[in-house]
Amino acid sequence: MARQNRFDRTSFQTQIIDLSHDGRGVARPHGEGDKVTFVTGALPGEVVIVEPVARNRHFDEARVVEVLQASPQRVIPRCSHFGVCSGCVLQHLAEDAQVVSKQRVLLESLERIGRVSPERVLPALAAESWGYRRKGRFSVRWVEKKGRTLVGFREHDPRFVADVSVCHTVVPQVGEKIALLATLLNSLDGRRDVPQIEFIAGDAVVALTVRHLQPLSEADRLALIEFGKEHGIAIFLQSGGVESVRLLWPDEVLLAFRLKPWDVEFVFRPLDFIQINGGLNEKMIAHALDLLGAGFGERVLDLFCGLGNFTLPLARTVDEVVGVEGDIGLVERARENARRNGLGNAEFFVADLTRDQRDAPWMRQGFDKLLLDPPRSGAIEVLKQLPLKMFERIVYVSCHPGSLARDADFLVNEQGFVLRAVGAMDMFPHTAHVESIAVFDRC
């Protein structure tokens, strides 16, 4: 017997009343007291016809079939793959409205989760919104039914790879060559054994890292080399973990970017973490250092420091700065970059900041101010261990408003800090990702 549908999929008309944190429209088709329906492709204020796609206990899900009354903030997406590819979810919303939405998500999270409100809301930071993505990972899949290789980000259904030919958010040296890259991979003997390709761009060099599950034939290696030569792209191969990455072409390459305002250059490896949006990154660093207000005569602690993205610029402006990071490879590069830039007042330590660090040597040092840039999970574990009373000011750079709100609750409502200011930063235009910065002062 054929399985019956579990719910009615009949399309219906509804009005969109809000935008969710993940970029979907919010409707209450059965009235204020009923559960919400999240509608993919809809914007606040619109009247739409939607098709139900899923039903859950606390909410339903649907997609737009037709827009009957469009929002004045609706725009035509630049990308023909929008709506299928999960790389972007907000291309149909005007750019200034995207930033306003992210600022709202940030403030609502602080109030709802953290039970805090800032004394001041900072103007949102924004930079170039197209061709900004200088690091990322494409999924690769040989599809037997299509008889060819697909290269792209995942579809909204993560089981599938979006069949894209170009990506306007990726740096043009890569984003405009996706179709050529797919053709190259399709020609390889080992096309079934390449699950992903990572890209990263420095100031002068763009690199691709080809992950392969089986050794590549000599013909495949030559094909990759020719692609690199033709398009001026460095090619790395990865047969296993991070330590297995090897340069295929050219014989030597230097991946680097420079932060001109502080005259520091960062050398990095192809799988290292760097901030995805280079233009916004420079604005963010300047903003963070200005808000921190640290100068000569002061010592600063920089947690989750990575390559030293904030640490090295700070070293130009303060007496001493200590960076702490859990990735030993990033710490090694941070130390080397400090040496290359002649910054003897920057010291780095390796530490898992989710574990007990109360006996760590850096924990026992005295500091005036704290800057931290944790991952999505936030920094609650290390915040609970720090002697917070020694910090006059804390600047917290966040990539997730929920974890920032939780940590703000701890700092303000348990430790007595004041949330002086907070603001969104549009590190990932056309996505629902919310980067932000917050300033806490000791009372």
Swiss-Prot record:
Active-site annotation: 399
Q: Which Gene3D superfamilies match?
A: 2.40.50.1070, Nucleic acid-binding proteins (2.40.50.140), Vaccinia Virus protein VP39 (3.40.50.150)
State if Nucleus is listed as a keyword.
Answer: no
Output the Pfam families linked to this UniProt entry. tRNA_U5-meth_tr
What UniProt keywords are attached to this protein's entry?
Answer: 4Fe-4S, Iron, Iron-sulfur, Metal-binding, Methyltransferase, rRNA processing, S-adenosyl-L-methionine, Transferase
* Annotated binding of S-adenosyl-L-methionine, by residue: 275, 304, 309, 325, 352, 373
Q: Which residues form the TRAM domain?
A: 4-66
Protein origin, superkingdom: Bacteria
**GO BP of this protein:** rRNA base methylation
Q: What is its EC number?
A: 2.1.1.190
The catalytic activity, as recorded, is: uridine(1939) in 23S rRNA + S-adenosyl-L-methionine = 5-methyluridine(1939) in 23S rRNA + S-adenosyl-L-homocysteine + H(+)
Q: Which molecular function GO terms apply here?
A: 4 iron, 4 sulfur cluster binding; iron ion binding; RNA binding; rRNA (uridine-C5-)-methyltransferase activity
Q: Where does [4Fe-4S] cluster bind?
A: 79, 85, 88, 167
Describe the family membership recorded for this protein in Swiss-Prot or TrEMBL: Belongs to the class I-like SAM-binding methyltransferase superfamily. RNA M5U methyltransferase family. RlmD subfamily.
List the PANTHER family hit by this protein, alphabetically: 23S RRNA (URACIL(1939)-C(5))-METHYLTRANSFERASE RLMD, RNA M5U METHYLTRANSFERASE
Q: Which HAMAP family match?
A: 23SrRNA_methyltr_RlmD
Report the function annotation for this chain: Catalyzes the formation of 5-methyl-uridine at position 1939 (m5U1939) in 23S rRNA.
The protein's name in its UniProt record: 23S rRNA (uracil(1939)-C(5))-methyltransferase RlmD
Q: What is the lineage of its organism?
A: Bacteria, Pseudomonadati, Pseudomonadota, Gammaproteobacteria, Lysobacterales
Q: Per UniProt, what is the name of the gene that codes for the protein in this document?
A: rlmD
